[in-house]
């Protein structure tokens, strides 16, 4: 090809050009370091200051596989793993039973907040555990004397129909019939006994039948429910057709391997009264308890971890929040099964501003997660997540999962209230648990004057006995995001494509690549951040997914 600047320059350039087929060989021989920075150099606070997610990028690697091959399986505690590394925060405008159910169905986990009475929180746990089951070991059972009105009330309460009727109205009593949604739907006399409408032509399976065998019987029977009975015809458990359909629609669902129930997590404080709360939650079927505190390195939390592990050894404990190795070490030594990392980085949190205490999230996650990994303790990057990129960066820093509050607060499944903003946009209420609005909420204390002593916000920020409440959070609103059934799959697909760009097929590969210096990073200047965002357009529509 002709050289524009003359033959002499062209000859000189030609003499320096090497055999292109040896590019990889020359790269390996002559370049002793990789492009970019390893994670330790990146996070050297002496050189760069403390960094958070927007301060750096991950460099691309080699793509040799489709994004669909990327798996996101990850532990959330020592004993519990998820298919998707996403959690919803235990905030009263983010996670109640509806969010917890859908996060679990989508492969993640929702942590139910505790800014409510213990009984209400236990009821939410119960709803999660009943939503999708394998063998239902504690089905709602009716007696022959129960009325049609009572059956309808139970359907309205639990959100499902199909109740077995036994002689004594209890489990392990002789099965006499089934009341289905169709039986009660158009029956007008609510005082009639259920025996007047129940179905007696039942298909059953014997006790000892495996779940796979029972599912086969249920498929072929075309019934909605399959009662499991012992040799004497006594009801011992139940299987639901609706769960078969959920299995088809939600293949990544977070379920226990034995019961096939959705995994449920809930938060509590570290006060003495929280022990009673936890007992109710465990009775309702709780799997994981999250000890909720803005500063987890306290004698209260250490003693609570030890008490929970001794009293309920089957329950996994996630402790926190922490941002330093020193904080983490005390909780790990006490027996924590997982750690929550973050202090002041949440979108509705002002702890760093008001208290001058906290740590930028990227360096906090790396410092704690790399230490906790030595003891097999998974870590949650909690706070500061605004987009898919932040999720990936939190995972790259060593977190096993990422917890989101504001990012999910605008979804249909969050308990916040919808309203129209002054600009005419549909928004949802969202507040930090350190906001005055959250700390003055009286639901946890059943409306009593001393409800501050039971409030989740005051407990989280050690403010139960304060005469003057000092806010560490704000109350506001977030734009409507639609349902998590569309938004979370978008986040998952985004993480898969990001890991594909990095050149890793799993979170284990990502962590291993970061630790070995294979996955590299680059600092970002203010100009680089501007360049990496939308620029130079007169107008644009930023639609994130379809």
UniProtKB/Swiss-Prot annotation:
Activity control note: Mycophenolic acid (MPA) is a non-competitive inhibitor that prevents formation of the closed enzyme conformation by binding to the same site as the amobile flap. In contrast, mizoribine monophosphate (MZP) is a competitive inhibitor that induces the closed conformation. MPA is a potent inhibitor of mammalian IMPDHs but a poor inhibitor of the bacterial enzymes. MZP is a more potent inhibitor of bacterial IMPDH.
Entry binding sites for K(+): 344, 346, 349, 531-532
BP term (GO), one: GTP biosynthetic process
Residues that hold NAD(+) according to the record: 292-294, 342-344
Binding site for IMP: 347, 382-384, 405-406, 430-434, 472
UniProt-annotated location(s): Cytoplasm
Keyword Zinc annotated: no
Reaction(s) catalysed (UniProt annotation): IMP + NAD(+) + H2O = XMP + NADH + H(+)
Gene Ontology CC terms, in alphabetical order: cytoplasm
InterPro entries for this protein: Aldolase_TIM (IPR013785), CBS_dom (IPR000644), CBS_dom_sf (IPR046342), IMP_DH (IPR005990), IMP_DH/GMP_Rdtase_CS (IPR015875), IMP_DH_GMPRt (IPR001093)
Cofactor(s) the record lists: K(+)
Pathway: Purine metabolism; XMP biosynthesis via de novo pathway; XMP from IMP: step 1/1
Disulfide bonds: none
Family from the record: Belongs to the IMPDH/GMPR family.
Protein task: Catalyzes the conversion of inosine 5'-phosphate (IMP) to xanthosine 5'-phosphate (XMP), the first committed and rate-limiting step in the de novo synthesis of guanine nucleotides, and therefore plays an important role in the regulation of cell growth.
Name recorded for this polypeptide: Inosine-5'-monophosphate dehydrogenase
Organism expressing this protein natively: Aspergillus fumigatus (strain ATCC MYA-4609 / CBS 101355 / FGSC A1100 / Af293) (Neosartorya fumigata)
